[in-house]
Amino acid sequence: MAIKKLLIASLLFSSATVYGADGFVVKDIHFEGLQRVAVGAALLSMPVRVGDTIGDDDIGNTIRALFATGNFEDVRVLRDGGTLIVQVKERPTIASVTFSGNKSVKDDMLKENLEASGVRVGEALDRTALTSIEKGLEDFYYSVGKYSASVKAVVTPLPRNRVDLKLVFTEGVSAKIQQINIVGNKAFSSDELISRFQLRDEVPWWNVVGDRKYQKQKLSGDLETLRSFYLDRGYARFNIDSTQVSLTPDKKGIYITINMTEGEQYKLSGVTVKGNLAGHSAEIEGLTKIEPGELYNGTKVTRMEEDIKKLLGRYGYAYPRVVTQPEINDADKTVRLNINVDAGNRFYVRHIRFDGNDTSKDAVLRREMRQMEGAWLGNDLVEQGKERLNRLGFFESVDVETQRVPGVADQVDVTYKVKERNTGTFNFGVGFGTESGVSFQAGVQQDNWLGTGNSVGISGTKNDYQTYVELSLTDPYFTVDGVSLGGRIFYNKFEASDADLSDYTNVSYGVGSTLGFPINENNSLRVGLDYVHNDLSDMRPQVAMWRYLDSVGVNPAVVQEGNKSSADFKANDFFLNTGWSYNNLDRGYFPTKGTRASANAKIAVPGSDNEYYKLTFDSASYYPLTDSGKWVVMGRTRAGFADGLGGKEVPFYDNFYAGGSSTVRGFQSNTIGPKAAYYKCAVGATSYSNCPIDSTNLDDAVGGNAMAVLSAELIVPTPFISDKYASSVRTSFFVDGGTVWDTNWENTPATIAAGVPDYSKASNFRVSSGIALQWMSPLGPLVFSYAQPVKKYDGDKSEQFQFNIGKTW
């Protein structure tokens, strides 16, 4: 039987001469060339069915429908009597995707972009998409100044209609800016203007921001910087007329020319506010006041608009429109600001939801909210909730979204999206140190116990000079009003002589409890009561120690040189503790802005064996240098003072110390300040006042009753760390300074003869500088620092590299 076949080659040509005006009836549909695609799937994508009478338009629609599936490179439709024959060539399946030569763009990012374009393993390969991808990647390289870059897609056929896809990159080098020319500037020099750019034709060694490598985005940012510079100085008619970027023939150098018109300076003649002000006209006008003769300032105009939006947002107007239309008078060189305000609808909050708190209970987050459900929306209250969640320290990140309720004109839902971090730490370690010998440490700390927000911890230390155990518990919401309750129990056996301190042994234990009372958003007060028992023994006579014992009426027998007293002194003390805290940091760990400050006082109450008070102050402030918070300046101040009451002195075992990773880095722990002046008594001596001082042993630290420590840090982005881990690592350069002194110290002929310094001086500041790295590891915060002492005194001990677990600042 002769077969009559006709090919429909183009959708634009008619086949009426073949099929006739009435077309033909499809009795069967037959496919040729199908491999991966099932016949049923192909039939479903066609608009033609067996029994249909079809014509030219139907054939065209069939071809278009099959191409639209993305499975075929070629489609042909033929007729054999009443049978419709569909010949197809399937697109090959992608078996693998690899990259070569890409250094500036990571594989993961490339895969994400390819998948967004439909190019992924297991899918059909669209060769036309590859051309677009090649061009898009090359355009990206051009935008970052790599004009010699090329991207080539290499397709390697495999059996069973499969292919390997490989993108081969030739990145080349970044074109460097040879010169930046500014044409049209009169009031300011080109050097002054270019100094504000990120792109530079010359970069001084100290400039860590400037860059000679051309990037299109950075140029756009620099042009905006230039525009803002002039608009903020009254040049209301300033305009950038054109920008030319030209390449050198070898595509390695770039010349940038910026043509601009400065215009003249304009002053503000007045401000008019009109529109729907929602009854807050007086407050809004207070935000738009100007000084007589004030220059036009673009940034101030923007700030006015933002302030008006924030004001209306506090009253529930979540989506106000504020548009400023400058009315420029070229005759007298003035500008009048016409501010149009549309407050819009007033919204109230239907629901507050939390997303991502898999461990923390909703109630723990909800009690931090200042925005209430059912109340008018206050944007400032919503932001306060975000800040309070960040300060908890339970979350790596906190984001908030305000969404309109569909179909309701005046309701919104507020959703806080949190990413929880590990708030519990368990550590066990065995180490060896030159001072501590073999050391065992173990501890468990959970700042968000079972998601309740309560903090529970137990820790212990065992080494050559200390055995310490502590159990602590804090409930930050002991009452619904936010009154906190904390308590601790501890035991400590401390052999100071083995810790490079003055010779004595102290066995102490105690219990304490504290109530905290919130005053407002950022301030709180604390009051508590502690009981502490101290049992002192093995005391080697030295001036500060025996001065204290004499003040409390203890006069042990004089011992000879090198021996320790057999005296056993016990003290039972009750302390009243009070304190004030201020905190407006933007987050609980690794803050970037805000201040944390605290002042504390404790005093021994009647019935105690000791009579003294102790005051401490600690403050840290963070000042971001960039909007991203990656560059931050931090300043910290710590100070303390203690003194006796009723003629008694402060116990030497409760002195202040400095030096080490938590105070003045670069110095050994607790070694800054007064040293022990040991008595050197001969046989038969009856009073220490007649004994000379041992001038050969002035190294053991004894601390003092006054302390001051200052720190300044520049927090910088951590190099070689991806954005994924940047939030858990912090690098900083620092300068530390501090001292400890004894206000009750008096040099005697014996101490002078032994060469003992005057420990009453507060001016003997030690200074160090260095670099620190903090890492919020799965084991808890790890702190590494390397510091070099810049200013030190006799008897100080250096320690350049220091490492600490569980401490951040």
Swiss-Prot record:
Record PANTHER family: OUTER MEMBRANE PROTEIN ASSEMBLY FACTOR BAMA (PTHR12815:SF23), SORTING AND ASSEMBLY MACHINERY SAMM50 PROTEIN FAMILY MEMBER (PTHR12815)
Domain of life: Bacteria
Keywords: Cell outer membrane, Membrane, Repeat, Signal, Transmembrane, Transmembrane beta strand
Domain (POTRA) ranges: 24-91, 92-172, 175-263, 266-344, 347-421
Family classification: Belongs to the BamA family.
GO annotation terms (biological process): Gram-negative-bacterium-type cell outer membrane assembly; protein insertion into membrane
Function: Part of the outer membrane protein assembly complex, which is involved in assembly and insertion of beta-barrel proteins into the outer membrane. Constitutes, with BamD, the core component of the assembly machinery.
Gene3D superfamilies: membrane protein fhac, membrane protein fhac: a member of the omp85/tpsb transporter family
Protein's cellular compartments: Cell outer membrane
Ranges that cross the membrane: none
Disulfide bonds: none
Record-linked Pfam families: Omp85, POTRA
Subunit text: Part of the Bam complex, which is composed of the outer membrane protein BamA, and four lipoproteins BamB, BamC, BamD and BamE.
Protein name: Outer membrane protein assembly factor BamA
GO cellular component, one term: Bam protein complex
HAMAP family: OM_assembly_BamA
Signal sequence interval, chain numbering: 1-20
NCBIfam families: OM_YaeT, PRK11067.1
